[in-house]
């Protein structure tokens, strides 16, 4: 099984702007510096994405703050799984190119965005992340407000450093943190939705890099409680040269259990059941969709075709020691995204 684990603290990029050590790690040992990148500022992409799901309350929210060079994308999603309802509002900004001052590390700093429609802030204090959001006209003239706290104790995460064969100065540096207990509330449409830290979790997708123009990727993530244990997973592929390592992993009580390849089996209709299978037999799942958060943007040189599907997963995952973890209707999401930008 491939999967080279990076274990040494070092600069992410060498003096030539090339990724020094492709592979994966349990925490961000490779140090990202925007100044080390040998590409135009319009090509640099930096983003923080949070998903917070409540299996007990049948709702969820997602938040994105990003600086993607010649375009910024700030986004909020509300999900009602009981009624299969979702709404997403996105604000696009032209040529941010570093103006958001995205932190160079995932373990510290704050990000703030404010305009006449949206105020959103991500804060990180000691072992706790805070999400604050006020979207004035989110849906049919109704605002959305949220204040959510995520516990972030020391635990394994999924960090990947991936190059592209066709461009030595392109790279994808990403950390996924799962299983962060959530508390707080969302106010929307006259209702208050409250997260219960006993059952509800958030996850972070922290990414920095320079991509090639045309990419399709697959990604899935889930966090929850199984038989009294914190359990989560991150699966995905399609992005860059993954010969050094996959980004497939299980999390069990804060410890990562690395997987090899996982394949998404998707029908043409994204709301039909999906299947997931693995080369090492350690992730075999059926997935029943609830909501397809579909989004299509096609504006000349910028094209994005997204299907982020939320649903419930059932099947078996196997830890490093052979322990089987059986999932039954485990709330999570999986996506297929094609981007040109």
Predicted regions and their residues:
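Structured soluble/peripheral alpha/beta segments that form catalytic or ligand/cofactor-binding pockets
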Residues: 1-341
